[in-house]
Amino acid sequence: MKKVILILALTIFTNCFSQAIKVDTNSYSTTQLVNSVLINSPCVSATNVTTRTGSNFGSVNGIGFFQNTNPRFPMKSGVILSTGNVTNAVGPNATELNDGNASWPGDSSLESTLAQSGITMNSTNATVLEFDFTPISPTFSFEFLFASEEYGNFQCQFSDAFAFLLTNVNTGVTTNLAIVPNTTLPISVVTIRDYLYNSSCPSANAEYFGSYNGDSAAAGSATNFNGQTKLLNAFATLIPNTPYHIKLVIADRSDSGSDSAIFIASDTFNIGQDVLGQDLTVANNTAVCFGSSHTLTTNLSPTEYTFKWTKDGVIIPGATSENLTITKAGKYGV
């Protein structure tokens, strides 16, 4: 009996860590992928959502929704943009990803962005997701990771590329947010790598490398990519009530070999819709949009009680009534 229980426990443990992501290309429209999956906020939404991928050129589709239960992959769900067939991103890491044909073009804005960093690229098989939005707060951020077949084999000298191009429509100024933290380097297998998986070159920003999914780790990989970065954060400070455009683009370098992908986490795409307070949440449908107000009520009689309100432990001068109208996030008490 003890042996049977042990075998059962090992089976359950193995299955827990070998779950692959699920990719869905049919349940969401392009606009729904952005507004319902990435942003998911009643406060602000994206407009003019457009995509471009291989299926526009007689090749494979590189855009889809994914879900995950594998603890080795740090996202539960989100949107995937791939330089190959997005459905082939499903793990385990068992096959080489070389999808796409010669009719699927690259992206000139990605090439121009890399050129500004001294990187020459002849791109192909580009997948693009872009939209307009007008923020109501200065905060812009989202969580993502980069995965690629090039990790291990080609991480020393050859890399696909991607960019998150944020443009202030009024000024025309564009900033690439897909950079290695605390640097100006575009993220790729060359700029984030660990020499343990290819000793031909030293590590580069290895603290941001997440996992190598080859060799003994292949069978338990959530995706079919050789490696991936850690969960990273793209962020910027915006001017409220100013129109912006964001272009998310990824492409193969030179040919369709060794595909790569960007995974963007659900509900993390903050395009300036900050809510008021942690307990007033989008998830509970109680969110208060930035710039709006909310009234805290004690339901106590002012004839029987005196009131002193605090914000973050500090007494608020003049706040002595039974109710308090607030416009800023914080921890309030009475």
List PLM regions with ranges.
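Solvent-exposed loop segments of extracellular immunoglobulin-like
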Residues: L300-G313
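A short beta-strand segment in extracellular, disulfide-stabilized domains
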Residues: A287-P302
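Short beta-strand segments within Ig-like beta-sandwich modules, predominantly Fibronectin type-III
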Residues: T223-G227, G313-T320
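Proline-enriched interdomain boundary motifs that mark the N-terminal boundary
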Residues: G272-N285
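Bacterial Sec-dependent N-terminal signal peptides
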Residues: M1-V23
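Solvent-exposed segments in extracellular or luminal domains encompassing
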Residues: T320-G333
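Aromatic (Trp/Tyr/Phe) and Gly/Pro-enriched flexible surface segments
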Residues: Q19-V275
